Amino acid sequence: MAKYVFSFRVPSDYRPDAGTPAEWQAWFGGLGSALVDVGHAVTDYASLGEVGGSGSRMVAYSVVSAEDMDSALALAKDCPVLRVGGGVEVGPVMEAAGA
């Protein structure tokens, strides 16, 4: 199994509501053993150059394991950010030599 990083992006004007933490917890729970690292929320955001298109910001990242890119995308398809007009960037993790 390969590892994939999920970068979660939301519209720049997004504000979470009271149900947001429970929604994320349920989604992470549904990933089961595919969730390698729940990751962290990003509390502040800045960028240099073109990153993810205008009008969105990164709010968190996680790492999952999957057979291939299609399987990783299938894991991301029900992510809560999609409900609010955001997106999930998915990419394979390249392990460092000697790690």
Provide a role label for each language-model segment.
Residues 1-99:
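Conserved, structured core segments of small domains
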